[in-house]
Amino acid sequence: MNAKIALTETTNIKEPEPVTTATATKENAFAGASDALGAGIDALFADQGAQYSLIPLDMIQVKTQIRESFEDEENTLEDLAASIKVRGVLQPILLRSNSEGYELIAGERRYRASKLAGLEQIPAYIREMSDEEAEDAQMAENIHRKNLTQIEEAKKIQRDLDKLGSVDAVLEKHQKSRPWLSKMLALLNLPEQAKRLVIENVSADVEVINTVKMVEKINPVKAKELVDDLKKTRGKENARDKAAAVKEEVKPSKKPKADNGEKTPKGRSHEELGQLDVFAGAKFDPFSDAHNGSESPRPLILSPVDVLNRAYTNIFEHGNSPKTILETMPKDEKDRVEGWLHSFYDAGKSVNQDVGRSVIQGFRNGTFSSDGDGAFALVAFLHGVESAEFHLLNVFGSVRK
């Protein structure tokens, strides 16, 4: 029997009775609840044998929930109630028994909408759990639904962008800012550890997600450790502060030291070759303009390197238009990126001989690369060598497949 029940008319509702697909195991019935809720409440009981019942709504007590808002302009309770009248309650809510009946743990929006729809009963899973387990379940469910909402919103924005063909038109339609648009679209292309924040219901905070992305780009191992820690301390400690601290930990030193034949620090190898410092004016510190995380929850400021690495992924790996990337980029980020790349353009203009040697030097010291920010730096440098007019769109367009 399908574990999802459709309740379309109150006249069709039977007396409360358990509906069982398999015998549920009581021992450790709540183990792994926070993880399982990542796929919805149904997933919580998939391995145990789902057991749910039709419970009268007037037997359910609703106590103070973590969630305070149950609707917005695009997701009203009236809309959900109308859907329930047609399709029924497709996902059971989660309850635990108490002396007066049942206490609602997760699914208050469905509970409220069912009352609006005129239902008398609702499908529910009933589980024994401690106060701590109940709070964890509420938090995991709320993070899960917020992430789903944000990702669906990001997909809708992308569809609007494709349809309208103009960033300004999308901003006007949604009455939002460019930084908001950039952050929302970034949710559609998350690396592994940042994606875990969403899939495993660790966080729905876009700032935390973006910070983990920055850490993961530099040190994937540290990013995994960070996500594991955030998952373990979810709801108990400040996630933004934790993420910002790890970002500070992994960012490169401004003045690395060479020792005993180790690789010469970035941007200094040319001195050993007796070469002219063609990159003297170029900006190498990838976090020189980044927010240090000490004043959370101040808005996150991405460094030029982070912005360029994100842009490279979107252009080269996902095939997005360079023009669209630049149009969606917040003005402050674009200004920093332009200044950063222009320094390499100026370095290229200063080279009057042996361009090949300068390029090799750039690859040796890590300034240039075949991908990421190093690829953009190389393109800007070569544009300077050729004395071509500097245009961000031309630089970005050069990294396409």
From Swiss-Prot:
It comes from the Bacteria. Residues 232-272 are annotated as: Disordered. It holds the Pfam family ParBc. GO terms for biological process: chromosome segregation. Keywords: Chromosome partition, DNA-binding, Plasmid. GO terms for molecular function: DNA binding. One of its GO terms (cellular component) is chromosome. SMART domains: ParB. NCBIfam families: parB_part. Belongs to the ParB family. This is Probable plasmid-partitioning protein ParB. It comes from Xylella fastidiosa (strain 9a5c).
